[in-house]
């Protein structure tokens, strides 16, 4: 007997435009031997947790149950792809591991893929360390959840553990507004022109090889800052001219590093970085399921990389211009239109635009989404980390995460690139 009414779960959820873009990234990963489009969130605790208790809480979640009982129905021409709820009775399983190295993630977990053909689209692991501490790890296919969606997921799980009532309407995407074909076509030409100009060659990418030499291998590195160091970083961002939070400053710092790598390899080309932009309305608490991100596109020539403040200023001008032109909203409309295109043609068009170059490197940030998440399942969280999906090429992703007023940089990379 389930503690929720299964009849309330949606029988069908149409993929958003951003979801379909992640389908393209799945195809990109398969082509280049880069592993899957899997995200992992790690929660560290100072004491051992009970796998049975965690599993019992997860089994009370309608969202977790839905994620364990869906299949992808790919759209044909003029049909949108969707998730179908097929209710096979699958329930989530919490796997347990013993790890000799403190805070490390077993390769067994990192090597598991969650493909679009998997039985379950979310997995859970509990890793025990010699000190008595543990890590709870959730892995999911990125097609289903974006950064804000994962925040909402863990808030939802806390509500489940506390037996709080929840609004099911906030868990899944609601009905879409219809857009007429003329509006789609006009918008498509504007977006196509903008992106082609923004991404035109020459663009330098850290991923120069066509295929990874060791199939599926992803390396990880986490750089953690104390709360005092985080305050200094935020103060430095303001001094450098990053007016709307530290994002532009952090992108500028990453870009400086990549430009040094470019010069070290004696390569030419500008940097081109598509940066996720949350498409939810400000203060919105849903939907949990589905990607609602759009993008801002930054191109940085070498002459604008002479200093961090110079790069911040150049990025700021591009950001303001794109927001003024409504590029994030236009790109969302473009992605929504592309859902009607068969996947093979979609991939061909996307890869042709940048001549196979998806980006110089990839950057994303969870902002303050996890900063105030201090407990999970009623237990205090010591630290939160994240292992992003690796898109190859470029084969280098920076994820900035803030928890308990402490910033960390979570880096996923291919040894073939870096």
Across the structure, where does each feature detected by a protein language model lie?
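Non-catalytic N-terminal regions of enzymes
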Residues: 1-185, 234-236, 240, 245-271, ...
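Flexible, P/S/T/G-rich "lid" or insertion loops adjacent to the active sites of thioester-utilizing
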Residues: 185-242
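Non-catalytic regulatory/linker segments of enzymes
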Residues: 6-7, 45, 221-223, 228-232, ...
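Acidic/histidine-rich catalytic neighborhood
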Residues: 273-302
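Short proline/glycine-enriched turn/loop segments at secondary-structure junctions
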Residues: 263-264, 284, 350-354, 387-388
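Helical lid/core segments from catalytic subdomains that handle acyl or acyl-like groups
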Residues: 58, 220, 291-369, 374
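A short small-residue
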Residues: 37-39, 228-236, 294-298
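Charged, glycine/proline-rich intrinsically disordered loops and linkers
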Residues: 179-209, 335-349, 354
